[in-house]
Design a protein with these regions (language model features):
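Segments of small-molecule ligand-sensing domains
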Residues: 300-309, 320-377
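Extracytoplasmic ligand/sensor domains, especially the bilobed periplasmic-binding protein
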Residues: 97-200, 249-274
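Short, low-complexity disordered leader/linker segments with a strong preference
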Residues: 1-31, 384-385
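Beta-alpha junction/loop-to-helix N-cap segments that form part of ligand/metal-binding clefts
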Residues: 29-31, 44-51, 63-135, 203-210, ...
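Immediate post-signal peptide segment of exported/extracytoplasmic ligand-binding proteins
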Residues: 21-34, 62-70, 161-167
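Extracellular/periplasmic periplasmic-binding protein-like sensory domains
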Residues: 238-312, 379-384
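Extracytoplasmic "Venus flytrap"
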Residues: 25, 29-54, 76-83, 105-108, ...
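Hydrophobic alpha-helical segments within soluble ligand-binding/sensing domains
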Residues: 85, 145-168, 208-211, 234, ...
């Protein structure tokens, strides 16, 4: 009887220990996950985000880890397909047992993955999409860092319209949650100055031919086009426009703010405006800290960094700072408790300060404008709050 009683107690103790154990956190390691486009239409963004994350993870581990624990990151490829993002989330959450999902790229993709995460109490931390659904409605497992696509365009479109005396504004947008957010932001911004779109036209995710959409906007006499496009589609639609002699003012969201636009699109991309926060890290940047960081990245990966590498780097950096403050007993709850009082100052890349609270899970609503001038992005406005 005594032996049986002892065995029963031991089993209960083991079960209690398992129940209390935090997924993704061991005595020696913290495992986080991310889902990127490493093979689809946003591959130029996803690969850079992954490398930026890897750079910061390696730095953290070289410096002793987080409270003595090494940081491990597992990255899955969605190919920019929400169905693959869902499967990737299932693997990361249920098989790899990640502590947190960080910097997952894509609006529809995050929406597909979040239910899988939330079922296992896994935070969706700083996704690489600026859709409002990333922090609305308020949820204990949602944290976003960037001004929304909606607010970016709501603030910047009226500014350009007024400055350039534009009378006719049109929009070309991806027919999904991302594109609709950009389109609606422009709609709200125009409404604030007594205007509306002259023409709206859309395309399906992954499209490569924009001739019919461009012809439609050209026929409508559009003087400015709000682009709900990412990388390949920005290049394709502007390239088609230039080819047909249609040269309006183009304004995109920060989804199109990266160096792939001018590197792949060439001279035709000059003049494009984009809303943005952190600036693209050129190897010959005027800022010495940015030059140092960019050249460190180049040395490690033999590739020029883009702003998506910066995003990946900063996301892991903020995660590490919060996890460090949460202490040795790192759990979802202890992380969230720190996060709900977190403030970050502006960084070397010009990102705005951020602040979080129990009722505010989006870091900043500030945006500024950049323009491609002579084949490089150049910041052309202060922050618009």
């Amino acid at each position: 009887m005594q032996i049986k009683h002892t065995v029963t107690l031991a089993a209960l103790a083991l079960a209690a220990g398992c129940a209390l154990a935090q997924q993704g956190v061991s005595k020696t390691e913290i495992t986080i996950g991310s889902i990127q486009d490493l093979s689809g239409p946003a591959v130029s963004l996803g690969k850079q985000a992954r490398l930026g994350m890897m750079l910061r993870v390696d730095e953290i581990n070289e410096q002793g880890g987080i409270n003595g624990r090494k940081l491990k990151i597992i990255v899955e490829d969605s190919g920019y397909d929400p169905k693959k993002a869902f499967l990737g989330a299932q693997k990361l959450v249920n098989q790899d047992k990640i502590f947190m999902m960080v910097g997952h790229i894509g609006t529809a993709h995050n929406l597909a993955a979040m239910p899988v995460q939330f079922e296992k109490n896994v935070i969706n931390f700083f996704p690489l999409t600026a859709a409002r659904e990333m922090y609305e409605p308020l949820h204990k497992l949602k944290y976003a860092f960037s001004v929304t696509y909606f607010d970016q365009i709501r603030k910047t479109a009226p500014k350009l319209v007024k400055e350039k005396g534009i009378k006719k504004v049109c929009t070309l947008y991806q027919d999904d949650e991302f594109g609709l957010e950009v389109m609606r932001g422009g709609e709200a911004g125009l409404k604030s100055i007594g205007m509306d779109y002259t023409e709206k036209t859309s395309y399906k995710r992954g499209a490569t031919d924009f001739s019919s959409q461009v012809a439609k906007m050209k026929a409508a006499g559009c003087e400015m086009v709000v682009l709900g496009t990412i990388a390949r589609e920005t290049i394709g639609s502007i390239g088609e426009s230039r080819k047909t002699g249609f040269n309006p003012v183009f304004l995109a969201s920060n989804a199109a703010y990266n160096d792939a636009i001018h590197k792949l699109g060439g001279k035709a991309m000059d003049g494009l405006y984009s809303s943005m926060t952190a600036q693209n890290p050129y190897l010959d940047d005027n800022s010495q800290p940015i030059r140092f960081w960019a050249n460190k990245f180049k040395t490690k990966f033999n590739d020029d960094p883009s702003v998506f590498a910066v995003y990946g780097y900063l996301i892991v950096d903020t995660f590490a700072k919060v996890a460090e403050k949460a202490g040795q007993n790192l759990t979802t709850d202890s992380f969230a408790k720190v996060m709900d009082t977190m403030n970050t100052p502006p960084d070397i890349f010009g990102s705005p300060s951020t602040s979080f609270s129990p009722t505010k899970h989006m870091g900043s609503d500030a945006a500024r404008l950049s323009q491609i001038v002579d084949g490089k992005w150049k910041v052309v406005s202060e922050y618009i709050n």
